[in-house]
């Protein structure tokens, strides 16, 4: 198999691009580095294309390894024919390789192997040959043997039937045909174990859908319902068509002595051996594809959450709401340093006196520290906390304080972690959580990288998936996001640094330790003095780490040190000095380069690299998050009972799933925009219309107070 050619066709790119990317990956370069600094080599393949390429490369290389193992095993048995070798080498999937290997795989003791041990294989051959002119019972008498444990004719025939059934089951062509036919024409159904039991799986108590039409989220829901023992799930195959096909392939002659017994064997082989195995394989394949789809959606949601724009330059009060144990508060300054923490008790069980005391405490903190924004976690008691905050803000209108509801998913996981304990050794879990909720609005990326991505909770059935596959995909998303933004080498935490291209957890800690011991970095080259950070790691990481106010102005940009010579020569040619970079004097630089091709040749670099350098010098360390929608800051409160059909509101997309999106409209119950209500045009997936963090206009089309459900529509509102 030509792996490069296969990937080229799948990704719909040029062969040279794939060859270059594979070479760079094999040389130990990271995806963010290749995507950002090797555009010339790959023809500007982006991080998403490179990750898809890497995933397929890994799968296809594993497939080739498996083929080589299988070929060696069959060859060692002396059973490898040219035709079989060609079939194995041409196989496109691991499943087909397994099908072809099945007859030669060392077998555990089965009914067929026991029958072979009893000397019944020749009888099976006679029946399968279909040439005998005697009744099979007569042929079987010759194989009755007390010594071999074959007591009578019936036992001899049963053993021969078992051998034939296994042979039919081992035939790769049959399995491939049956799997394809079942996938094409079969269905999956589910029934309730107890129809009286109420559960979230009630729509699956009597459910059936064709396999080819089954949506990924339904497959994952069926799996979970089955795992939790609410439903029974089965694959319904086109059995009559399958048996007709098998009979036609197995029964070659119309022999009245063998045809009846072979029909029985064919049915037994399918129902006992082939059918259950194919059912398992189909469900496993459907689950894999559903997981891949869900992981893709989870990754997109996570990326949008990580790439939310920071609300910089504000003193923020983080509010972690709770009932009985009180609301934990933490004030952090504009750099994220915690200035003060306390606990207030304005939520149930409470009194007017406690509510007044809470308001006074918060007003005092606002006055003392110059708080201009309150970040409220969206968990338990958020609604009640919000009401107290709104009432209090009305008492101090001159302060111009606003509040924002912040997704607190994962904050409790972080606050109880070893990392949080090291960061805030003198705080309790609640105070750490409040500080995290405050910092999340100041710099969402820097705060969210401290939490296991799975705990951030913007996925679908994430806990039911292959955790290794999920972890790898989400780590890739975090890595790409961190490197897109880049970090300040002198302020970034170890949690942030470990996601930078080429940096491991150990090296991230070493960078922080070096900083603490030697003071701030003044030059990117200083990174080479950090323990375990060698030339290769430096090449991979340097461009993503910036130094403000260092010795070299280019260190404050995303220009890679390998291009400093070219960047300096460019500035000189256009009449600028390096200091003009940090002074912001290079706006409009792109218009001064009249001929990029000629200039690139003069500088000895590629044209794409030159364009990237110019873009970076024009606007150094540009933050891609600036283009994302800003969070909605509020000063008043709306309740679910205030909603009326037809109302148009602004909301924030909190989660995107296969069948729609949940939108926070400020009433503490996210509303659902079904995929059919997103846009007038047809879309296959909600991600074509919205992403997590988007600010959208929605119309209320239904409110169910009893079930606490809000139905929303975006049709005709978002141009």
Task: Locate each region found by the language model.
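Duplex nucleic acid-engaging cores and interfaces of nucleic-acid transaction enzymes
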Residues: 49-51, 59, 63-73, 77-318, ...
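A glycine-rich phosphate-binding loop feature that marks nucleotide/adenosyl-phosphate handling sites
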Residues: 180-187, 319-323, 379-381, 405-413, ...
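Generic start-of-chain signal for non-secretory N-termini
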Residues: 1-19, 26
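Long, highly charged, low-complexity intrinsically disordered interaction regions
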Residues: 3, 55, 61-80, 89, ...
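Structured, non-catalytic alpha/beta "coupling" segments that mediate domain-domain communication
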Residues: 73, 87-90, 98-100, 225-238, ...
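Single-stranded RNA-binding regions, centering on S1/OB-family and related RNA-binding modules
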Residues: 550-551, 555-719
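Short, ordered loop/turn segments at secondary-structure junctions
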Residues: 37-39, 128, 238, 321, ...
């Amino acid at each position: 198999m030509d792996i490069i050619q296969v990937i080229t066709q799948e990704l719909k790119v040029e062969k040279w691009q794939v060859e270059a990317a594979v070479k760079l990956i094999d040389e130990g370069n990271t995806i963010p580095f290749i995507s950002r600094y090797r555009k010339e080599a790959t023809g500007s393949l982006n991080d998403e294309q490179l990750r898809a390429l890497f995933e397929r490369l890994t799968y296809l290389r594993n497939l080739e390894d498996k083929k080589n193992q299988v070929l060696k095993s069959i060859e060692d048995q002396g059973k490898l024919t040219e035709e079989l070798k060609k079939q194995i080498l041409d196989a496109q999937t691991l499943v087909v390789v397994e099908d072809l290997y099945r007859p030669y795989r060392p077998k555990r003791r089965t009914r067929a192997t026991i029958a072979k041990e009893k000397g019944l294989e020749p009888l099976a051959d006679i029946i399968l040959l279909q040439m005998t002119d005697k009744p099979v019972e007569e042929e079987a008498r010759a194989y009755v043997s007390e010594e071999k444990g074959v007591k009578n004719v019936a036992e001899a025939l049963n053993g021969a039937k078992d051998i034939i059934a296994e042979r039919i089951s081992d035939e790769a062509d049959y399995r491939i045909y049956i799997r394809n036919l079942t996938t094409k024409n079969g269905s999956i159904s589910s029934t309730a174990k107890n129809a009286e039991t109420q559960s979230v799986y009630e729509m699956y108590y009597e459910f059936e859908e064709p396999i080819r039409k089954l949506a990924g989220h339904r497959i994952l829901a069926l799996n979970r319902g089955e795992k939790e023992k609410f439903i029974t799930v089965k694959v319904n195959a086109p059995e009559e068509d399958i048996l007709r096909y098998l009979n036609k392939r197995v029964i070659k002659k119309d022999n009245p002595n063998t045809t009846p017994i072979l029909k029985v064997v064919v049915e037994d082989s399918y129902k006992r051996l082939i059918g259950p195995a194919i059912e398992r394989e189909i469900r496993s394949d459907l689950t894999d594809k559903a997981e891949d789809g869900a992981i893709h959606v989870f990754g997109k949601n996570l990326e949008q959450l990580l790439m939310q724009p920071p609300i910089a330059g504000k003193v923020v009060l983080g509010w972690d709401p709770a009932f009985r144990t009180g609301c934990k508060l933490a004030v952090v300054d504009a750099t994220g340093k915690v200035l003060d923490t306390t606990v207030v008790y304005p939520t149930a069980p409470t009194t007017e006196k406690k509510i007044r005391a809470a308001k006074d405490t918060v007003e005092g903190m606002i006055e003392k520290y110059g708080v201009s924004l309150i970040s409220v976690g969206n968990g338990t008691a958020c609604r009640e906390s919000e009401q107290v905050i709104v009432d209090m803000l009305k008492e101090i209108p001159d302060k111009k304080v606003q509040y924002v509801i912040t997704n607190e998913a994962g904050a409790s996981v972080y606050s109880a972690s070893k990392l949080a304990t090291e960061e805030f050794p003198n705080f309790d879990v609640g105070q750490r959580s409040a500080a995290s909720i405050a910092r999340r609005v100041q710099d969402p990326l820097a705060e969210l990288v401290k939490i296991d991505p799975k705990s951030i909770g913007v996925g679908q059935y994430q806990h039911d998936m292959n955790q290794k596959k999920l972890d790898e995909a989400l780590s890739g998303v975090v890595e790409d996001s961190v490197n897109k933004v880049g970090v300040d080498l002198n302020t970034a935490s170890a949690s942030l640094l470990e996601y930078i291209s080429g940096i491991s957890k150990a090296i991230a800690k070493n960078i922080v330790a070096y900083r603490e011991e030697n003071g701030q970095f003044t030059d990117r080259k200083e990174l080479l003095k950090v323990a375990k950070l060698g030339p290769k790691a430096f090449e991979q990481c340097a461009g993503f780490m910036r130094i403000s106010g260092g010795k070299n102005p280019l260190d404050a940009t995303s220009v890679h040190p390998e291009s400093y010579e070219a960047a300096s020569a460019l500035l000189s040619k256009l009449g600028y000095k390096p200091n003009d970079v940090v002074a912001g004097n290079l706006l409009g630089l792109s218009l001064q380069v009249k001929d990029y091709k000629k200039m690139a040749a003069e500088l000895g670099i590629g044209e794409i690299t030159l364009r990237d350098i110019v873009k970076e010098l024009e606007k150094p360390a540009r933050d891609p998050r600036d283009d994302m929608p800003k969070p909605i800051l509020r000063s008043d409160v709306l309740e679910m009972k205030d909603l009326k059909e037809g109302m148009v509101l602004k909301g924030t997309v909190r989660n995107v799933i296969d069948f729609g999106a949940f939108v926070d409209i400020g009433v503490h119950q996210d509303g659902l925009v079904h995929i059919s209500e997103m846009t007038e045009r047809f879309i296959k997936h909600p991600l074509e219309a919205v992403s997590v963090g988007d600010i959208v206009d929605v119309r209320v089309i239904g409110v169910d107070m009893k079930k606490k459900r809000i139905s929303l529509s975006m049709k005709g509102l978002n141009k």
